[in-house]
């Protein structure tokens, strides 16, 4: 089972939530508050000290764009063609500043 850890707001996790929902994967939306975030940070549970993170059977993935790409691959949303795949990456990276 996958477990997406983020605050109870759309923010940097909403596109990930959509991709995970489209993937058909078994996943949990684990909302945390500020106190839980601080506790996870102090415990070293957040690889870069930030959320969102996606906890997988293979380990934890940090950084929203990396998680979105992972979820997109699970959902079959990432093109196999190298050019089209790069265009998808371009879109994801272009959305980051927003």
Model-found features: residue ranges?
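GST-like domain detector, emphasizing the conserved glutathione-binding G-site
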Residues: 1-98
């Amino acid at each position: 089972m996958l477990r997406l850890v983020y605050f109870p707001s759309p923010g940097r996790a909403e596109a990930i939530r959509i991709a995970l929902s489209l993937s058909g994967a078994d996943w949990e939306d684990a909302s945390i508050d500020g106190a839980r975030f601080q506790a996870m940070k102090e415990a070293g549970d957040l690889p870069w000290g930030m959320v969102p993170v996606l906890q997988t059977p293979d380990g934890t993935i940090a950084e929203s764009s990396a998680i979105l790409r992972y979820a997109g691959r699970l959902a079959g949303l990432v093109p196999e063609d190298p050019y089209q795949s790069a265009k998808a990456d371009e879109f994801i990276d272009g959305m980051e500043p927003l």
